[in-house]
Structure formats: structure tokens, C-alpha cells
């Protein structure tokens, strides 16, 4: 696969209703700590949850990051600023109305040349291994895939998009938040190339031109995964057997993350 520019996209425009009321965006909740230099001395300081994602993107070597924000999310801009502290240029795109993650991702399209490779993760999640994006990118390039999903085990399939693979790591099944299922892998992070980006844009364009846009249901990334499978795109899954994935979207999950990273 021809090497292209690798960028990161962080969708952070959601309202975080499950943790409301809270005076800060959920992406800015403190989980764990970081070591910083203060007057020549190393000191511990709180670490916000979205910083784990930014650092994982940095490990993968992305050249720039786009963070899509919405109303009430300007604390994110104030915290990360231009990305200088992380060695990566960070730009922000404003989404006035949260319509679903795919729409947030598609807002980045006008700012791209159309040949980039994208790494994407959710800023209210923490996952291991730390180099998961780096390994996902390597697999994506080796497989010459259109979309490659990073997969993690879970005992709570009803909270995630669940993925089935064949022996060649091809994605052959996707079910969103099933109450019961034989599937054991959730998709947590993603890597894609130009063909998938074009497909997502065309799917959203088609939905917007009809009055039956999911009959009021929010369009989710899983809808685009399904569209890619139906279109015959090369969709792969990379399982992280020893990894873990925490979505801090509820109080219990936030408590688990705080205890794990204290």
C-alpha cells in the first residue's frame, strides 16, 4: 500500500447526557495523573480522559489532529490549544448541532486532499495497549484495507458495536449493542483510507436528501461499517487479545477508570 499522510480525527461534539449534570465536557474529566516539570521538579498533575487518546495518536505518528467540537466544548480548545505541547498540530472544527458521529467525521472532509489515512478514536474512552493505533495502522497498511477496526473483548455487548471475524481477520458481521450475542469483540478504534471516506460522505449525502433519515434514529458509525460491508469494501479487524477498553460514559465506568488509573 502506498504510504500516505496519516491524520487523527477526534469526534468530541456529543453532549454526554449520561453523565449530566457536570460543569465540564466529559472529555475533560480527570482520570489518573501525568508527570510534568514545575520549576525543575517532577510533579503529579491530574490527567484528563481525552489525553490518553491524543497520546495514543502521537505514538502512531500522525502528522496533525482534527478535533470536532460542539456547543459547550470550548474547554477542550483551551486545554489542548494548538497542540504544541504534544508535538502535533491540532485544529478544531465546530459542529453546531450534534447529528451523530459520522456527520462529525465528515465535517473534516473539506480540509483533506482525499488521499489521507485516518486514525479515529473516541475521546471519552481509554484503551490498552498504548501503541494500539500504531499497530492498527501497520496492519491496515499490510492488509491494504479500506477500513480496519481495532477490537477489544467485552462482557457487556449491549453497550458496544460488536464484530465478527473470519480466520483471515475479515469483518463478516456487525451488530450494534445486542442484548445477547455470540460475538465477543467490540470495535473501539478505527483506521481508514480514501475509499471508506468517500463512501461515508456519499452515504450521509444520500441520507440527508431523503425524509426517511433513519426515521429519527441518530446515524451511527456502525451504519457506515454496514454500508462498507455491503459495498464490498475491504474491512478488516485487528483483535487486541490482551488489551482492554473503557468507555467512561456512565458513572460506573468512570469509577472503574479512576480506580484503574489512580
Regions found by a protein language model. Give the residues of each.
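Conserved beta-loop-beta/alpha segment of the NTase-like Rossmann-fold superfamily
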Residues: 76-78, 84-167
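Short beta->alpha linker loops
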Residues: 71, 96, 131, 155, ...
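Residues at the starts of beta-strands that form the adenosine-phosphate
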Residues: 5-7, 63-65, 89, 117, ...
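Short, well-ordered beta-strand micro-motif
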Residues: 30, 164, 191-193, 247
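N-terminal glycine-rich phosphate-binding loop and ensuing alpha1 helix
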Residues: 2-76
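A structural signal for short hydrophobic beta-strand segments in well-ordered beta-sheet cores
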Residues: 28, 163-165, 237
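A conserved hydrophobic position in a structured secondary element of the catalytic/binding core
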Residues: 71, 128, 191-192, 249
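Catalytic-core segments of class I nucleotidyltransferases/pyrophosphorylases
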Residues: 141, 170-245, 252-262
Amino acid at each position: 500500500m502506498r504510504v500516505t499522510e496519516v491524520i487523527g480525527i477526534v469526534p468530541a461534539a456529543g453532549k454526554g447526557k449520561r453523565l449530566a449534570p457536570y460543569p465540564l465536557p466529559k472529555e475533560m474529566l480527570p482520570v489518573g495523573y501525568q508527570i510534568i516539570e514545575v520549576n525543575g521538579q517532577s510533579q503529579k498533575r491530574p490527567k484528563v480522559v481525552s489525553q490518553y487518546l491524543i497520546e495514543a495518536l502521537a505514538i502512531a505518528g500522525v502528522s496533525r489532529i482534527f478535533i470536532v467540537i460542539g456547543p459547550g466544548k470550548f474547554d477542550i480548545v483551551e486545554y489542548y490549544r494548538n497542540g504544541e505541547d504534544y508535538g502535533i498540530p491540532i485544529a478544531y472544527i465546530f459542529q453546531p448541532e450534534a447529528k451523530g458521529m459520522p456527520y462529525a467525521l465528515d465535517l473534516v472532509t473539506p480540509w483533506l486532499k482525499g488521499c489521507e489515512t485516518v486514525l479515529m478514536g473516541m475521546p471519552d474512552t481509554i484503551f490498552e495497549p498504548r501503541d494500539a493505533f500504531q499497530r492498527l495502522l501497520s496492519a491496515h497498511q499490510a492488509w491494504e484495507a479500506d477500513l480496519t477496526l481495532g477490537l477489544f473483548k467485552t462482557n457487556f455487548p449491549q453497550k458496544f458495536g460488536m464484530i465478527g471475524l473470519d480466520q483471515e481477520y475479515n469483518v463478516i458481521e456487525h451488530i450494534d449493542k445486542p442484548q445477547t450475542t455470540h460475538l465477543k469483540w467490540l470495535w473501539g478504534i478505527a483506521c481508514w483510507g480514501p475509499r471508506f471516506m468517500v463512501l461515508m460522505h456519499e452515504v450521509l449525502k444520500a441520507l440527508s436528501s431523503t425524509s426517511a433519515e433513519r426515521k429519527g434514529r441518530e446515524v451511527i458509525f456502525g451504519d457506515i461499517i454496514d454500508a462498507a460491508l455491503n459495498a464490498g469494501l475491504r474491512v478488516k479487524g485487528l483483535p487486541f487479545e490482551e488489551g482492554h477498553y473503557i468507555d467512561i460514559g456512565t458513572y460506573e465506568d468512570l469509577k472503574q477508570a479512576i480506580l484503574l488509573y489512580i
